[in-house]
Amino acid sequence: MYKRQALDGVLELAPYESCVVVLEASGAIEPADCTDTSTRATLALDISHPWTVALSPAGSDRTFGEPQKLERLCDLTAEQFPGVCGTFRYRTSFELADDLAHTVIDLGDVYEVATLTLDGQTLGTRICPPYRFATGALTAGAHELAIDVINTLDHATSDIFALTEPVAPSGVLGPVTLLGQNLPK
């Protein structure tokens, strides 16, 4: 997320999260945005409901197979796609009743690399937690969400370590949530 803002000297980061802070060369400090957000409720919308998921096997030309319906988020290599590696494409839609400001989509637990697309716009790629994507303001109405998750080759290849070490899960385990603030009416 790129935004200009004044800092109060405290920077809170989630585990594995990083942030680049750029200071003005002049040393000038701009006043903070003093908008009162205390009257705006923070909204958390669970979007872990039914998804479709399709697989593009590793080494393919990124052609995805027929989408399968998922009633719940789970380890895909333990259930729907055992013993495979590649890219899993998740799709779902959700509806917002009101306009929201400062929204973030949090994918919860993901294994391994996730790229998020909202309403046709790619919002970025994450390689480790937190799997959070700033979406900016969202308008009321229907929204389309797609997540491409790439797992690792250890799901398709057996080796001596696989006998004693468990293989990590694959895919989005969730919960997937949309966090935001209601805009004042």
Task: Kindly give the residue locations of the regions a language model identified.
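Short strand-edge motifs at loop-to-beta-strand transitions and within beta-strands
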Residues: 7-9, 19, 88-92, 129-133
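An acidic-aromatic loop/edge-strand motif
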Residues: 28-88, 138-185
